[in-house]
Amino acid sequence: CENRIKSLLVDSYQVTKHYLQSLSKLVTVIYIDDLNRFLYPVHTLICYGDYWRKFHYKEKYSNTNLFLGSKYIPLRQAFKNQEKKKIKPQVENLLFLSGGTDHFHLLEGFLEKLEKEKYQKIQVICGRYYDEYEKLRSQYVDFDHIHFHKGVRHMENYMMEADLAVSAGGTTLYE
């Protein structure tokens, strides 16, 4: 069948060895890893973290295509052609990024402890699955220099404007 899936890219922490084994019997599986939780039964393994050497992939995977290192970071096109960021001597603009959900309410904790008056602008970007967005935003309605956003497009604009960013893990750190 010409519409049959030939390859599948998997990027999830929820996978199990059994799941990947089952998929690998049906299609060519490409797995993005950064935890090295177990030996992944896949055709191709990508680890774009600079720490890939500590996982000893080359010794463990003799029959798997390996793509290791930061040259394989899946950056969005907008980040590939950015001009170099000019670093200011003083931090005036802050950027907080929670990732998708912020289960541990880190944004709330950061904002609570932060000396908010020290900064000209504070951008707070919540992931689209962050349930406490309206509650958090309403707590800072009296602060004109604190701006809240949810599920933004063009993240690169916020990053270029920021003098300092605090981020959840993931690809955002490379961006």
Stretches with model-predicted labels:
Residues 89-162:
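Donor-nucleotide binding loops and adjacent catalytic segments primarily
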Residues 1-61, 66:
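Active-site and donor-binding regions of nucleotide-sugar-utilizing enzymes
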